[in-house]
């Protein structure tokens, strides 16, 4: 997780299209819009403002569609900006639907934090997924007094993130502080034992 205001431009790529045939004719969707109809949201790549805004908007839209049905958040992310990630986190906690989280590939840093923040009992990973937790990183430059101000702020952020992680994982704050002092990598089995996820899914139930 990084404590910075840096903007990362969206990496545009070719998005597959799917065609549905109905009595009224054919309708085409990009694959992510079609999956959104199934209440599936993808969080892939670095967490930054543009991506976070899209995910937040999708969650609010799905809540308006049906506040009783689960939302499924698929995560494959190396982490990213803390404030961007916290906008997703706060929305997950705010909306009425349960948010079931899935890790495919990796969930590192803010990705792991959001994975753990899913509804208890509905947090999953695939067998070869990798998780990583650590403390926030900062890279502020400026006058000495400003650096001191930002250093105090990042320590406050670190403590708050650790408190939330402890709540969702079910460990003490002291354990989380110790375990996130350096990069801590977890395999699927280790993530279950640690409490980051609730189960490993090797096939659809």
UniProtKB/Swiss-Prot annotation:
The active site is at residues 109, 134. It is an enzyme of class 3 (hydrolase). Pfam families: CLP_protease. Keywords: Cytoplasm, Hydrolase, Protease, Serine protease. Belongs to the peptidase S14 family. Cleaves peptides in various proteins in a process that requires ATP hydrolysis. Has a chymotrypsin-like activity. Plays a major role in the degradation of misfolded proteins. This is ATP-dependent Clp protease proteolytic subunit. The lineage of its organism: Bacteria, Pseudomonadati, Pseudomonadota, Gammaproteobacteria, Candidatus Palibaumannia.
């Amino acid at each position: 997780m990084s404590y910075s205001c840096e903007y990362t431009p969206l990496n545009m790529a070719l998005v597959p299209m799917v065609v549905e045939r109905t009595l009224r004719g054919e309708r085409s969707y990009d694959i992510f819009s079609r999956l959104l109809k199934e209440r599936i949201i993808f969080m892939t790549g670095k967490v930054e403002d543009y991506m976070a805004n899209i995910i937040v908007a999708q969650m609010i839209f799905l809540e308006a569609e049906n506040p009783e049905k689960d939302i499924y958040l698929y995560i494959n992310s190396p982490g990213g900006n803390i404030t961007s990630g916290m906008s997703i986190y706060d929305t997950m906690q705010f909306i009425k639907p349960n948010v079931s989280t899935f890790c495919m590939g990796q969930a590192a840093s803010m990705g792991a934090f959001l994975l753990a923040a899913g509804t208890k009992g509905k947090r999953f990973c695939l067998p070869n997924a990798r998780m990583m937790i650590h403390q926030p990183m900062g890279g502020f430059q400026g006058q000495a007094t400003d650096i001191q101000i930002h250093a105090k702020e990042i320590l406050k952020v670190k403590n708050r993130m650790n408190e939330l992680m402890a709540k969702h994982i079910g460990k003490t704050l002291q354990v989380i502080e110790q375990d996130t002092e350096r990069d801590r990598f977890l395999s699927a089995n280790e993530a279950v034992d640690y409490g980051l996820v609730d189960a490993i899914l090797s096939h659809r139930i």
